[in-house]
Amino acid sequence: MQIVILKNSAEVAEYGANIFKKQLQSKPDSVLGLATGSTPVSLYQGLIEANKLGDISFKEVTSFNLDEYLGLAGTHPQSYRYFMNEQLFDHIDIDKANTHVPPGDAENPIQACDGYEEQIQAAGGIDIQLLGIGRNGHIGFNEPSSGLMSRTRVKTLTKATIEDNARFFKEDEYQPHLSITMGIGTILDAKKVVLLATGENKADAILATVEGALTASCPASALQLHKNAVLVIDEAAASKLSDRDFYKHIEAENQKLLARLAKS
């Protein structure tokens, strides 16, 4: 894994946005894997601005989101389809017919999961997958104990995840306890994975992901198996890593090498 440690959340978002800009500039018809939650919002704002400036276009892009609450239609304000429309799709030149979010209101959720996998394969697979990470190391809604080669399926949310997400729901509002999520195996199939994490509350999860054992107890640890995974984290999220200066040194040397290769 490539570990990039930056000062704060603003730098994390900017770095992540630049990765996606370069992807779209080199391959305008990219298949993007997208995520929801508070962490990607600033990254999306950077992409919206770049699109308005004409630096990138989404006209040829196909996208697949990681997950969706089971039981919420896409028009529900707390659904992830609604979130993506508000935070990204409504503000860029993407064809919404090419944007895919697992159907939370599917009559047959199991069949819908199989269909989602088929859609990803039909699109040629995901070129670059954006991830956040939960306090317990979950990616997407792959909670601890998830199979490391799992595919898109229905998952029960842990109490910790339900509590973390409760802030998005009104006190008397129905909050789903089930979801449809890409599996860890589905995520690992992406050609590149970019995980963003900020804040001290993610430090334990980042420690387990980077330096811990490969285990279903920390789903994000599966990224140790990926040949092109980038973790972009701030100082707070990196605070429990054993040798932050070493990771920074590695990244600095990597950037020097890339700069030298770019000139040759």
Swiss-Prot record:
Gene3D superfamilies: 3.40.50.1360. GO terms for cellular component: cytoplasm. SUPFAM superfamilies: NagB/RpiA/CoA transferase-like. The active site is at residues 67, 136, 138, 143. Keywords: Carbohydrate metabolism, Hydrolase. GO terms for biological process: carbohydrate metabolic process; glucosamine catabolic process; N-acetylglucosamine catabolic process; N-acetylneuraminate catabolic process. The keyword Hydrolase applies. It holds the Pfam family Glucosamine_iso. Homohexamer. Catalyzes the reversible isomerization-deamination of glucosamine 6-phosphate (GlcN6P) to form fructose 6-phosphate (Fru6P) and ammonium ion. This is Glucosamine-6-phosphate deaminase. It comes from Shewanella woodyi (strain ATCC 51908 / MS32). The gene is nagB.
